[in-house]
Amino acid sequence: MNFKINTDFTNYMKVFLVQNAVLNLISKNEEKFLWEKHVYDSLGIKLFLEKYSPKVNTLLDIGTGGGFPAVPIALEYPNIEVFALDSIRKKINAIENIKQELSINNLTTICDRAENIEQKFDIITSRAVATIDILIKYATPLLKKNGYFVAYK
């Protein structure tokens, strides 16, 4: 992929690594690939968002885990209200800590399961969570009319 990134992710990666040392959000072996495998990969949606971003106000990341792709998208697109959903409290707490440390005002964390969410979203993302058929089952009812579901696979 070839696209321009407008955000300096240096502070984010530092804060993430501090949280990771405590909570093991990604394996220690994965830390050396944080930029390539997690941050840059999360921004793979960038070309799509640039085409449709005037129409995008809300984005839900189902099964956000360590905050990918939710946090990089929130940092790169301050005009989009990003919701990071995960059922595991320690992961949500870590993302909340990152949010506070970096003052990410357009990021909301939700500790719950997708089937319990009632709000509708313009875009739903999911990365490394479940099989595509299960993801479609959870995502479809949460999409606004003419919304988009983007599965990172």
Language model features by range: what are they?
Residues 66-79:
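Conserved SAM-binding loop of SAM-dependent methyltransferases across substrates and taxa
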